[in-house]
């Protein structure tokens, strides 16, 4: 039998077998996982593309990082008018209750404001004050928001807050952190901090020394360099790694650093913050200090022009994410943010010791998702996150820019966009209704976008003001869209089922149901997740299970 005829025969056979297999949850889980995997490879093969896989209009302009939800917080202009949603009432679009439209008023009431909704700045600072532990959440002492849960969250975020410069919000160039000097003769710690570089450190002073001594490591080829760098990146802590070519389209058009000012804390120490926390806590309102702005000049701030970007992914804990929107789910996000800085710093040191320049970055400096797509790590999903084949959206992305020329990976397609068109589970699970219910992505025009979105690229609309408003109300980040995602599994056969479902007309309408039949993820409805006791039970399971569920 010829190869083409054999393939067609196998495809037809696999379609029938796979359709029968996915009809029985127990059969799939216990007996026919290899069959499903084989079927997926034939029915929905993984493909590589040489070009960026999504449309980018000629009108596209680089994204201004100061427009993202958290960076916009520190623009004093954002504190003058109520926060604005792109759609005032999404029930007119979805036909379902808009669970997010009242959040600005509820958040204002938390701040003691009567008669108007909260501003963008008030909304974000309400979240950040609770997130830092300086203000109790409204669910304080409920299961998932207890002092034990909050302490775990604080520990998980500690490196990001204390040693990374809180670049989770964006920023650049590099990071700056306040540290308290210690007198080595008396062991006394100063009350006033000094500003020093954080883990996202762009100091490349050692590189020239290595080169001048003739010690720069020479790889035999770009391919060998990529192989060695990827191996090192995994050893240094990354779960997934890919190489993207440097693409200026994804570098922010403006870099910015939050202006920090000294605030006297109740313990007498001085803490440098981008908002006046004591004033807020005493009922004096929310005051922010703005940004220092920088042109994105690589040579000026990092000493080199990038040629390659090492993009890596860190897995988030499956059990912790299941507890969303509890503080436990925030803790695994914080752990990944803390680890992002550590791993990126170690990769940068590795490159510098080889005699190559490096700039380690988290969410700052450039757009991580399109770089990760270019690096072959996954596809962009409905929820705006990178969907990887192994972890789905349950991860965080960081990157290291370098002047070492590496052989780039290619973008990969494995059925995510086709599945997202059919599923819409993340949109249904969002408490703020921030995720589009439209079936297909499109090249967004300015009128389709809220202020934090960049038009002229192909994607689904997201309203970060709605998302951020729920975070403020919840007192903690929300990961519902990650928790319920059909790609968020620890058994990869489920991903194969998802790929197959997008290719079989009889199964397409049931695509999102498969993992629900198999007992994953809990309720999709955000109110039901809490009211049914599901979240509380997942929190108890998290604390009572001594071993983490691993991929």
Curated annotation (Swiss-Prot):
Location within or outside the cell: Cell membrane
Regulation: Activity is inhibited by ammonium ions. Photoreversibly inactivated by 1-iodopropane.
One MF annotation (Gene Ontology) recorded for this entry: oxidoreductase activity
PROSITE patterns named among the record's database cross-references: 4FE4S_FER_1, 4FE4S_FER_2, TAT
Family: Belongs to the PceA family.
PANTHER family registered for this protein in UniProt: IRON-SULFUR CLUSTER-BINDING PROTEIN, IRON-SULFUR CLUSTER-BINDING PROTEIN-RELATED
Protein name: Tetrachloroethene reductive dehalogenase
Species of origin: Dehalobacter restrictus (strain DSM 9455 / PER-K23)
């Amino acid at each position: 039998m010829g190869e083409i005829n054999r393939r067609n025969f196998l495809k037809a056979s696999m379609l029938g077998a796979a359709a029968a297999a996915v009809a029985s949850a127990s059969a799939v889980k216990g007996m026919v996982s290899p069959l499903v995997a084989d079927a997926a490879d034939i029915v929905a093969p993984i493909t590589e593309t040489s070009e960026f896989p999504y449309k980018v209009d000629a009108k596209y302009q680089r994204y201004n990082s100061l427009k993202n939800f958290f960076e916009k917080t520190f623009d004093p202009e954002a504190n003058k008018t109520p926060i604005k949603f792109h759609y005032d009432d999404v029930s007119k679009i979805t036909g379902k209750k808009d669970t997010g439209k009242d959040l600005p008023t509820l958040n204002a009431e938390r701040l003691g404001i009567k008669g108007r909704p909260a501003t963008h700045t008030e909304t974000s600072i309400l979240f950040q004050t609770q997130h830092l532990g300086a203000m109790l959440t409204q669910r304080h002492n409920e299961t998932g928001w207890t002092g034990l849960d909050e302490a775990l969250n604080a520990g998980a975020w500690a490196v990001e807050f204390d040693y990374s410069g809180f670049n989770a919000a964006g920023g650049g160039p590099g990071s700056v952190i306040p540290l308290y000097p210690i007198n080595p003769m008396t062991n006394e710690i100063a009350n006033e901090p000094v500003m020093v570089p954080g883990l996202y450190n762009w100091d490349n002073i050692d590189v020239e020394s290595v080169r001048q001594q003739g010690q720069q490591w020479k790889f035999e080829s770009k391919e060998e360099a990529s192989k060695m760098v990827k191996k090192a990146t995994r050893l240094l802590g990354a779960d997934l790694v890919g190489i993207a070519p440097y693409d200026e389209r994804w570098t922010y058009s403006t870099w910015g650093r939050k202006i920090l000012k000294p605030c006297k804390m109740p313990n007498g120490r001085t803490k440098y913050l981008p908002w006046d926390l004591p004033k807020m806590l005493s009922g004096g309102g929310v005051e922010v200090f703005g940004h220092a702005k920088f042109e994105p000049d690589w040579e000026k701030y990092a000493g080199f022009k990038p040629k390659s970007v090492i993009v890596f992914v860190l897995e988030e804990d499956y059990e912790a994410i299941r507890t969303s929107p509890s503080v436990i789910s925030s803790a695994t996000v914080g752990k990944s943010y803390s680890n992002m800085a550590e791993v990126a710093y170690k990769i940068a040191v590795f490159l510098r010791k080889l005699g190559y320049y490096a700039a380690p970055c988290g969410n700052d400096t450039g757009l991580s998702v399109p770089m990760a797509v270019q690096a072959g790590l996954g596809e962009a999903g409905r929820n705006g996150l990178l969907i990887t084949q192994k972890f789905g959206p349950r991860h965080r992305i960081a990157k290291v820019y370098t002047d070492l020329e590496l052989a780039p990976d290619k973008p990969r397609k494995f059925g995510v966009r086709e599945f997202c068109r059919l599923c819409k589970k993340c949109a249904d699970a969002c408490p703020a209704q921030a995720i589009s219910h439209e079936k297909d992505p499109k090249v967004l025009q300015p009128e389709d976008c809220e202020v934090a979105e960049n038009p002229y690229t192909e994607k689904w609309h997201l309203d970060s003001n709605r998302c951020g408003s729920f975070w403020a109300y919840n007192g903690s980040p929300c990961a519902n869209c990650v928790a319920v995602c059909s790609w968020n599994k620890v058994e990869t056969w489920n991903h194969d089922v998802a790929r197959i479902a997008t290719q079989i007309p009889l199964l397409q309408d049931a695509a999102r149901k498969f993992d629900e039949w198999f007992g994953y993820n809990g309720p999709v409805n955000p109110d039901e997740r809490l009211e049914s006791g599901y979240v509380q039970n997942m929190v108890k399971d998290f604390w009572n299970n001594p071993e983490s569920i691993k991929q």
